[in-house]
Structures are given as C-alpha cells and as structure tokens.
C-alpha cells in the first residue's frame, strides 16, 4: 500500500498524519504503525494523505432513511442491524454492510420534486451524489441548484393472493363465523376477476355480487395488514388490491388510497419495497353523510412518477405524469454529526426511502479497468 517511491516509514508517517491536529496522537499512532501493532484497512493505507483526489468517507447522517427488505429504516437503525438487504443502482436487491464513520461536518441538501415535494438529506461535504444523465458523481460541496438526481423504483408483479387480501382489507367485512363477505357493485365489475380467480362463491344482488369467503378460501387474516417480512410481490399486490377497493385516480392528477392511521404508517414503511412512495396525506372530515367516523381517516397520496399501468386496476392511467427527476434546491451547513454509509458491492449506490439514488462511500479514487491503471494507482 506504499505510494510509488515511498518507503515503509514514509507510508506510516503519511497515514498517521491523518491525526495531525494532535501531535500526541500523531506520534502515538505513527509508533503503532511502525511497529505493526495495528494496521488500518488496505484501502485506507493507500488513500489517506495520498497526493490524488480521494475521499476517505462520504457519508450520510443517521436520520437518513433507506429502503431495505425489512422496510424503510434510518441509517442509524441499519447500522445497528449491521447488514441489510437494500436496492442497488441496478434495481437489484443486494446485501450490504452499513458502517459508522465517526463525527464529521455535515450539510443539509434540500431536494425538491418540481417544487411540489421537498425533503432534506444530511450529508458530508465529500458525499458522492449520483447525477442524472452522467457517469460522473458530484460531491455535496459542488452541488448547484437545479442539479438533477435520479429517481427510481422497483415495481414487482403482484402476488394474486395479496391482491385479494388488499381488496377485502379495503372493502370487505368480517363475519361472526370467522369468514368474510364482500359486496361488489356492478359498476366495479373489474373486481370480479380478482375473486373469480380463486373460485370464491357469490350470490347476485340487485346492485352486483355478494362474495362469501370461508373455510379453505381464507388464506390469511384479511382485515389485518400484511406481516413484517412480506415479499415485494405481496406488498405490491396488497397495495393494488387496496387501491381497487378504496382508491382513486384523479385528473389533478393524483393516485390516492383512503385509509386509517395504521394503513398510512404501513404504506410509508413498506410501500417503497414495491415502488410506492407516499408523498402526503390529508385528514378527512369526521362527519359524513352516514354519520361520524369511528377513527381518523386519510386520503393518502403517492408519487406519480413511479405509478404504472399495473398499479391502476381502475381509473384512467393516461392521467399519470411523465417521469422526472429530483432537483437540488439548496445546500446549507448543518453541523457536526455522526455519519453512516452502506458499502454496496455492486454499484456503489443505493435507494433512499423516497426513491432517490445515492452514491455510497469509498476510500480510493476511481481508476480505469486496466493493468496499467491499477499499477499506476
């Protein structure tokens, strides 16, 4: 890990110089290195103090939320877990360690979606941001207003049982004999195939069909939310089923699901696993034409950029807006904070909870894939 023409002693002095703010620490660390009582990781030895543009740790604050197979979690919680399965820059689920990198100066990067949705990410000055339409990455310190950050979603196919689960959760009723009934009006006939696919018995009414679920037709607790650990396919199917029961696609345009606090919280935590990003919710009036609601109810809105035809089991998909990226609005100093970052082995990038693609930290410069470049580095 010595640089070209560098002696072992010179290498130890260079690495120890990372603690140059304290001569006592510098001397103690240099002595430790010289006597080989401790050796840092090879990438650190080759990069720290090297006369080339490198960035030892490019990290994010602990409150930054990322998408994992266990749902959305903060970087701090991911670090406590140690290894998580997250979504890389190719849209693949991969395992990655999440590491703490000490206390560093951080900055608030304010990101906006065409001025409608704004959020803040805390990052170090050297954090490498993936930029839309470019293979190059930009440091936090070099971000400008208007810099475009890619927006992504992984949209799996629906688990058929999950669609039925979501449909009954949203519009069905539990019976005293541990079964379920669901009345589907004729104007919602697009719902029929979801239930007919499982040969659910029904009777005709003057308004449509009344479906009855009992015995072998009950595969789960249909009036409960999917459990922790549900697959992306199950999450996708459930959300699409709830939309079919209690959702609407408006000309504003908006993709909306109506639900209670627990559904809202579940969608915020697990929706991103299937590419559904909640952007907000408005509380509905407690008083309705049918009386007073027994619990708080919300219109829950989703980011339209990742809504697909498969998500729209009813409504006119042509209302959906075209894809657009996140845009940097401002960068301001935040202060000293403990920072964290995953180490993604495939793309050195991963998805944040809102679908924004972020780079991860690295400790050596990017070099060309050739033996000459490797030897020169």
Regions inferred by a protein language model and the residue ranges of each:
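Fold-independent oxyanion-binding glycine-rich loops
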Residues: 69-70, 87-90, 151-154, 171, ...
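Long, continuous compositionally biased terminal/linker segments
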Residues: 217-224, 288-323, 331
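Extended catalytic cores of very large enzyme megasubunits
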Residues: 1-63, 143-147, 155, 159, ...
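Intein-associated homing endonuclease modules of the LAGLIDADG/DOD-type, together
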Residues: 43, 61, 81, 98-288, ...
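Long, charge-dense accessory insertions within large macromolecular proteins
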Residues: 60-94, 319-324
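Short, structural beta-strand-to-alpha-helix junction motif
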Residues: 7, 69-78, 137-141, 231
């Amino acid at each position: 890990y010595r640089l070209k023409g560098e002696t072992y002693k010179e290498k130890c002095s260079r690495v120890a110089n990372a603690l140059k703010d304290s001569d006592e620490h510098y001397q103690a660390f240099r002595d430790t290195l010289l006597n080989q009582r401790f050796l840092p990781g090879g990438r650190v030895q080759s990069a720290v103090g090297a006369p080339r543009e490198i960035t030892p740790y490019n990290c994010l604050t602990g409150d930054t939320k990322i998408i994992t197979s266990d749902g959305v979690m903060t970087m701090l919680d991911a670090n406590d877990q140690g290894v998580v399965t997250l979504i890389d820059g190719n849209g693949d689920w991969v395992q990655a360690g999440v590491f703490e990198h000490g206390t560093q100066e951080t900055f608030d990067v304010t990101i906006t979606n065409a001025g409608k949705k704004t959020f803040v990410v805390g990052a170090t000055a050297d954090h490498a941001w993936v930029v839309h339409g470019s293979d190059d990455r930009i440091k936090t310190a070099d971000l400008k207003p208007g810099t475009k950050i890619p927006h992504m979603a992984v949209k799996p196919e629906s688990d058929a049982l999950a669609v039925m689960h979501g449909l009954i959760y949203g519009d069905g009723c539990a019976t005293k004999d541990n079964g379920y009934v669901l009345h589907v009006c004729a104007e919602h006939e697009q719902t029929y195939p979801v239930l007919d696919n499982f040969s659910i018995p029904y009777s005709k009414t003057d308004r449509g069909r009344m479906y009855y679920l009992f015995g072998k037709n009950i595969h789960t607790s249909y009036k409960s939310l999917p459990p922790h650990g549900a697959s992306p396919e199950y999450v996708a199917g459930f959300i699409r089923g709830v939309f079919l029961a209690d959702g609407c696609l408006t000309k504003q345009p908006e993709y909306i699901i109506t639900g209670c606090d627990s559904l809202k919280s579940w969608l915020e935590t697990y929706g991103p696993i299937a590419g559904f990003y909640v952007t907000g919710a408005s509380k509905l009036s407690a008083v309705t034409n049918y009386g007073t609601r027994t619990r708080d109810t919300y219109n829950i809105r989703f980011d339209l950029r990742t809504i697909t035809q498969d998500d729209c089991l009813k409504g006119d998909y042509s209302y959906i807006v075209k894809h657009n990226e996140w845009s940097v609005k401002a960068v301001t100093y935040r202060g000293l904070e403990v920072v964290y970052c995953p180490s993604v082995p495939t793309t050195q990038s991963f998805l944040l909870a809102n679908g924004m693609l972020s780079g991860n930290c690295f400790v050596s410069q990017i070099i060309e894939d050739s033996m000459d470049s490797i030897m020169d580095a």
